[in-house]
Structures are given as structure tokens and as C-alpha cells.
């Protein structure tokens, strides 16, 4: 038994969980006990236990199946002395079997092999459209009337855009609700309240002085700036990971930071704070890391787009990588269709896994522990694709 509480022994949140948090928490401790019995290295024990339980939770569709798989795993940890090549979860090998000392998926070591593989993974336009991407080959009507009334994306109150700077009480939950399959309740991770709670916190655990909104349709997005396209920008094929931080203004949802990372060298090619077009309401500093003093002398939207839309950066042949990249391209007001979106590629059924969870599950890397770092997020999405496709994460000389 582990002598004292280990802060890292917490289950990773999932959109749908086979059992409740407490049950998953107890299982992690049982796995730790089993690993200790076979003298598993203590320095790696906590991380390994959490990753094993996460795989159990993802592979088990019901609470009964979860408990069955837990029993098998605990037995096998002791039986095989935690040999990862012999352990199975839901009858699937923990580590893929190898042939002649190499895994079934041969590692990709040349630039040409990388391009070939990534081209095969490009998401088709219909899938992009279904996932909220604004596409250039769809006829939109920017002159279509845009409503003067919008719904607050935080509290759900309908309000007039003209009143956006009026002081109000906007109560909301900063975290998205998660469904707990064992209790059949929707829980807000930010405060632990459920949607069926009678507590006053049910309406929200955070308060702001202004309502805020996001433009969703092409017409609404064009009220800030018209869309640009990469179609006319010729250049060599390249692969770029991209991430934007966004803030709320009087004109909606705007880009306040843009980071671009090169796939092959992992170097940050561009990282700029951006002065939004509308008057700032909330820069989402808690998540974006951008503060009001940062934007005083920052570049404006037009200058930034002029910087990045060029032959040697974002061009018509670029493969862009990100997580939920439709949000980034929408705030950039950019048409582009050569996309690798980890939120789509590695979703669980109709539920999209968070970048934070994917990063921990696939890379054993913890991100977004405090203020979001757009370079960290861009690199995480890029490395997930590398790890899933036999491309070295550490190789920088191609």
C-alpha cells in the first residue's frame, strides 16, 4: 500500500465514463498496489497506473465490463510481473506485437515518407464541413442580414449587441459539463455541481460583468473581417502546427495570439500577440495567457495575416495541423482545406476528446495545467500525429 497520498493519482476525465470518479480513483490505487507487489519502479509507478486505468475506462463500455477488465488486469500484473508485452486490456495487447524485432508499423524516417503518410491522412471536405469548417467552395451570402440580438455563450441569456458594454450579472460555469455514466448525471468539473442540483451554484460558479457572444455563420464572421484564402498563394508543400488564443470583444470572438510551429524541426516560426478589432471585453487570460497590457502595442489583424500568408509559410500547399482547428481558422477568417485535426481524427464515436486528454493518453504528457500556451498546444497536436503514425517526435534533422 502506498504510504501517503500521491497528487498525480487522479483519473483522466472522459466525456463518458463507465463508472464514477471515486470508483476510478480506487482502481488506480489498486493498480498501484499490484505494481508495488512486483517491484515496479516507484518513480514511474503513478504515471503508469493512471495510464492503465485510462485505457481500462476507454475500452469498457459498461460498469460491469469495466470491473471485469480491472480484475483481469490486476491478476495479470502480478502473474506477468508487469511485463508490458504480456499485459492485455479488454483482450487487446498493451503494446503491439512485434515481428522480427520491429513493430507492425515501420517507423517513418524520411521527409518524403512523412509527406506521403500525411497526405493519406488529410480530412475530406465533407467531414470538414460537418465539423464546422467554413469552406471556400460553398456559396455564402455575406450580405445576408445578421441579427442584432445574440445569445450569451456563457450563461445563455439573449441580449442586444448594442448593450454589450452594459454592466450585468453573467453567471456561468467555465468548464464544460461531463456525463457520468454510473450516476447518469452531468457534472461541471469546475465546481463539482450537477445539472440536477438545487444549489445556487447550479446556475454558475463564476461571474462576469458582461455578456459575450461568438459569430458562428459565415455572415456573422464577416462582420469583423472578410475571409481570406490560400488558393492564390503558391509555395512549396510544408507542414505547420497552428494554434490561436481567442478573446471576447464588442464584435464577438477574436484572435489575440497566433503561434505556428514547423512539423519537421519543432521550431516556433511565428508567435505574435494580436490587437483585436473590437473593444476588449474579456481576453480569457485564465486560458489564453494574454493580458490587456500585452495588446497595447501589438500588431493588428491585417498585419499578422500579411506576415503568415506567404509562399514560405501558409500557402495553398501547406498541411495545417491543430486540435479543433475550425475555431482557429474561423478567427483567422481563413479558407484552407489541407487539414489534419486531431479532434476529428482521434474522436471517440461522436464525442471529441480534449487535447489535454489526448496528450496524456498518447504522449504521457501533461499540458494546460495553468494558462494555455499556444506553442505547447500546437506542438502537442503535432506530436500526437507523429506518435500515432510512427514518426519520431525527437528527430529534427531531415
From Swiss-Prot:
Protein name according to UniProt: RNA exonuclease 3
Its job: 3' to 5' exoribonuclease required for proper 3' end maturation of MRP RNA and of the U5L snRNA.
Family recorded in the similarity comment: Belongs to the REXO1/REXO3 family.
Organism of derivation: Candida glabrata (strain ATCC 2001 / BCRC 20586 / JCM 3761 / NBRC 0622 / NRRL Y-65 / CBS 138)
Domain named Exonuclease: residues: 239-385
CDD domains registered for this protein in UniProt: REX1_like
InterPro entries the UniProt entry points to: Exonuclease_RNaseT/DNA_pol3, REX1-like_exo, REXO1/3/4-like, RNaseH-like_sf, RNaseH_sf
TM region positions: none
One of the GO BP terms on file: U5 snRNA 3'-end processing
Domain of life (superkingdom): Eukaryota
GO MF annotations, alphabetized: 3'-5'-RNA exonuclease activity; nucleic acid binding
SUPFAM superfamilies referenced in this protein's UniProt entry, alphabetically: Ribonuclease H-like
Keywords linked to the UniProt accession: Cytoplasm, Exonuclease, Hydrolase, Nuclease, Nucleus, rRNA processing
EC number: 3.1.-.-
GO cellular component: cytoplasm; nucleus
Chief location bin: cytoplasm
Lineage of producing organism: Eukaryota, Fungi, Dikarya, Ascomycota, Saccharomycotina
Subcellular location: Cytoplasm; Nucleus
Amino acid at each position: 500500500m502506498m504510504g501517503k497520498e500521491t497528487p498525480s493519482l487522479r483519473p483522466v476525465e472522459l466525456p463518458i465514463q463507465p463508472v464514477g470518479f471515486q470508483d476510478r480513483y480506487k482502481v488506480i490505487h489498486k493498480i498501484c498496489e499490484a505494481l508495488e507487489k512486483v517491484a515496479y519502479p516507484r518513480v514511474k509507478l503513478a504515471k503508469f497506473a493512471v495510464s492503465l486505468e485510462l485505457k481500462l475506462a476507454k475500452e469498457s463500455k459498461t460498469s460491469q465490463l469495466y470491473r471485469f477488465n480491472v480484475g483481469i488486469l490486476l491478476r495479470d500484473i502480478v502473474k506477468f510481473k508487469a511485463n508490458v508485452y504480456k499485459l492485455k486490456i479488454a483482450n487487446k495487447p498493451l503494446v503491439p506485437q512485434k515481428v522480427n524485432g520491429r513493430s507492425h508499423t515501420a517507423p517513418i524516417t524520411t521527409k518524403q515518407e512523412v509527406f506521403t503518410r500525411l497526405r493519406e491522412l488529410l480530412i475530406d471536405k465533407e467531414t470538414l464541413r460537418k465539423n464546422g469548417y467554413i469552406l471556400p467552395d460553398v456559396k455564402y451570402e455575406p450580405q445576408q442580414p445578421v441579427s442584432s440580438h445574440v445569445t450569451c455563450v456563457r450563461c445563455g441569456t439573449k441580449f442586444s449587441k448594442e448593450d454589450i458594454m452594459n454592466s450585468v450579472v453573467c453567471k456561468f460555469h467555465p468548464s464544460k459539463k461531463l456525463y457520468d455514466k454510473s450516476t447518469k448525471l452531468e457534472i461541471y468539473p469546475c465546481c463539482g455541481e450537477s445539472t440536477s442540483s438545487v444549489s445556487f451554484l447550479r446556475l454558475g460558479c463564476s461571474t462576469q460583468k458582461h455578456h459575450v457572444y461568438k459569430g458562428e455563420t459565415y455572415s456573422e464572421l464577416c462582420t469583423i473581417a472578410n475571409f481570406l484564402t490560400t488558393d492564390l498563394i503558391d509555395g512549396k508543400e510544408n507542414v505547420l502546427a497552428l494554434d490561436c488564443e481567442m478573446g471576447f470583444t464588442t464584435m464577438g470572438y477574436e484572435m489575440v495570439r497566433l503561434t505556428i510551429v514547423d512539423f519537421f524541426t519543432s521550431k516556433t516560426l511565428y508567435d505574435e500577440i494580436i490587437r483585436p478589432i473590437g473593444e476588449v471585453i474579456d481576453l480569457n487570460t485564465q486560458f489564453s495567457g494574454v493580458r490587456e497590457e500585452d495588446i497595447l502595442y501589438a500588431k493588428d489583424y491585417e498585419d499578422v495575416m500579411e506576415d503568415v500568408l506567404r509562399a514560405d509559410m501558409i500557402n495553398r500547399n501547406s498541411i495545417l495541423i491543430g486540435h479543433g482547428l475550425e475555431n482557429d481558422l474561423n478567427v483567422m477568417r481563413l479558407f484552407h482545406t489541407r487539414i489534419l485535426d486531431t479532434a476529428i481524427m482521434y474522436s471517440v464515436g461522436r464525442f471529441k476528446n480534449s487535447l489535454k486528454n489526448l496528450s496524456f493518453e498518447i504522449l504521457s504528457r501533461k499540458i494546460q495545467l495553468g494558462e494555455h500556451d499556444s506553442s505547447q498546444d500546437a506542438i502537442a497536436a503535432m506530436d500526437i500525429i507523429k506518435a500515432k503514425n510512427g514518426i519520431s517526435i525527437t528527430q529534427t534533422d531531415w
